[in-house]
Amino acid sequence: MSTAITRQIVLDTETTGMNQIGAHYEGHKIIEIGAVEVVNRRLTGNNFHVYLKPDRLVDPEAFGVHGIADEFLLDKPTFAEVADEFMDYIRGAELVIHNAAFDIGFMDYEFSLLKRDIPKTNTFCKVTDSLAVARKMFPGKRNSLDALCARYEIDNSKRTLHGALLDAQILAEVYLAMTGGQTSMAFAMEGETQQQQGEATIQRIVRQASKLRVVFATDEEIAAHEARLDLVQKKGGSCLWRA
């Protein structure tokens, strides 16, 4: 029987906004960090939560997502003031983050601004993208945090606005459910029904236009496209290309 201790930190951030072109983090700042500690698949209550003064204004679009106002952040510490405590908290742990590229990009950017030669986060933490895990488990389905809550019947009624600590707490429950065993029979049957319906629809299209060559996107192309849409939707609040 293994006695190894597994320490995971489920983490989320809120920011002043994001760039649609180029590096999504450049010129923007983290304004909230929420992290939940999980040891051997148990929530410990040893959480990390802080609001940060960004020394720049919050974009209106980002404010619409998380509701964190410029005035509220005026008396909060800067990232530089909490960086050491934050690094000590996450060092050596497995970070579980939904759409990890977004948050890790911001974290590495903030560390680089300190001019202290701090290495990339993935050199002192293992990084697990829970969105990538969900996509492997449920290909072709919506795998946003809200969609996963509905799938696993996890209460997210308090999530009227995005908040880093609340989102981290919800994600911790979701991730434990995702990695804890098989899903319910009802959900499995629902998935099979949807798959059968999808296959039937494809067959009808082929019969009606048998001479038309249909070129489908590869799995890699679909994954890359969905990743970009998730990045836009996660911190933009909405995505034009999704209903």
UniProtKB/Swiss-Prot annotation:
Its cofactor is Mg(2+); Mn(2+). GO terms for cellular component: cytosol; DNA polymerase III complex; DNA polymerase III, core complex; replisome. It is an enzyme of class 2 (transferase). Keywords: DNA replication, DNA-directed DNA polymerase, Exonuclease, Hydrolase, Magnesium, Manganese, Metal-binding, Nuclease, Nucleotidyltransferase, Transferase. SMART domains: EXOIII. GO terms for biological process: DNA replication proofreading; DNA-templated DNA replication; lagging strand elongation; leading strand elongation. Gene3D superfamilies: Metal-dependent hydrolases (3.20.20.140), Ribonuclease H-like superfamily/Ribonuclease H (3.30.420.10). It catalyses: DNA(n) + a 2'-deoxyribonucleoside 5'-triphosphate = DNA(n+1) + diphosphate. The active site is at residue 162. A divalent metal cation 1 binds at residues 12, 14, 167. A divalent metal cation 2 binds at residue 12. InterPro entries: DnaQ, DnaQ_proteo, Exonuclease_RNaseT/DNA_pol3, RNaseH-like_sf, RNaseH_sf. CDD domains: DNA_pol_III_epsilon_Ecoli_like (cd06131). Binds 2 divalent metal cations. Magnesium or manganese. Substrate binds at residues 12, 14, 61, 66, 167. The keyword ATP-binding does not apply. GO terms for molecular function: 3'-5' exonuclease activity; DNA binding; DNA-directed DNA polymerase activity; exonuclease activity; metal ion binding. Its EC number is 2.7.7.7. NCBIfam families: dnaq, dnaQ_proteo, PRK05711.1. In a ternary complex this subunit contacts both the beta sliding clamp (dnaN) and the polymerase subunit (dnaE). The DNA polymerase III holoenzyme complex contains at least 10 different subunits organized into 3 functionally essential subassemblies: the Pol III core, the beta sliding clamp processivity factor and the clamp-loading complex. The Pol III core (subunits alpha, epsilon and theta) contains the polymerase and the 3'-5' exonuclease proofreading activities. The polymerase is tethered to the template via the dimeric beta sliding clamp processivity factor. DNA polymerase III is a complex, multichain enzyme responsible for most of the replicative synthesis in bacteria. The epsilon subunit contain the editing function and is a proofreading 3'-5' exonuclease. Contacts both the beta sliding clamp (dnaN) and the polymerase subunit (dnaE), stabilizing their interaction. This is DNA polymerase III subunit epsilon. The gene is dnaQ.
